[in-house]
Amino acid sequence: MAVGKNKRTSKGKKGGKKKVTDVFTKKEWYDLKAPKMFLVRNFGKTLVTKTIGKKLATDGLKGRIYEVNLADLNNDEDQAHKKIKLCCDHIINKDCYTDFCGLSITRDKLCSLIRKGYTLIEGYTDVKTIDNYQLRMFCIAFTKKRPNQTKTTCYAQTSQIKKIRKKMVDIMNAEASKVMLKDLVKKFIPESIGKEVEKQCKKIYPLQNVLIRKVKILKRPKLDISKLMELHTDSKEDAGKNVKSLPESKEATNILSAELKH
């Protein structure tokens, strides 16, 4: 005889069915604000658990990192191959104020650049900006054919690769060490550093597709809320512009002159 539970004698479960509760009733939405170096300032929303007792909702938001496509931040599809990381540093009411936290290019873009018959050259260096941000920058470049070249391949020699890599490191150090982080981010968007590398390395070996492949933030200074809010407020130049006075219509002047006569 098989040993098992007798269905007749077994008792039913206590409590019955559990109540189905909606998880989203315990959560709330916050707006995400991007720094003024980008065109789109409100780039999305984020979800967090509401404040319960000593556990504050803001504590769950601070330090969150959001990866956003640069095409969405600048309304430009030509920049869709770049991804920007923004870190939430400060919360006011329902607004999360973010700061730049890193950059990278998409895998699709990187795979489309790597081709047979060309030399890939990559260099990286650790730099420090004026406002004490320590970054690690990675630069990538590819050789290209010289004018009137009949040879199908264009491989660079080891000595040429070393010279190009040294130039890369020198240019990245020079460009980053003289500016603040916000000014450096403005250089990343139009690839001005990559163009400078391409220009200076032309004599060594002609290059193409020179990009800042990745930017990591190794160390950040202590949070200064006043400096963070400067990144999110518009400059005084726009606020101080004079508005041109509109010309008065003839009907308005006639009415005023008639009232003065009476």
Curated annotation (Swiss-Prot):
Gene Ontology CC entries for this record: cytosolic small ribosomal subunit
Q: Which family does it belong to?
A: Belongs to the eukaryotic ribosomal protein eS1 family.
> Which positions, given as ranges, span the membrane?
none
What GO annotations for molecular function exist for this entry? structural constituent of ribosome
One record GO biological process:
translation
Q: List localization entries.
A: Cytoplasm
Q: What is its main location?
A: cytoplasm
Keywords on this record? Cytoplasm, Ribonucleoprotein, Ribosomal protein
Self-association and partners: Component of the small ribosomal subunit. Mature ribosomes consist of a small (40S) and a large (60S) subunit. The 40S subunit contains about 33 different proteins and 1 molecule of RNA (18S). The 60S subunit contains about 49 different proteins and 3 molecules of RNA (25S, 5.8S and 5S).
Which protein, by its recorded name, is this? Small ribosomal subunit protein eS1
Task: Give the signal sequence positions.
Answer: none
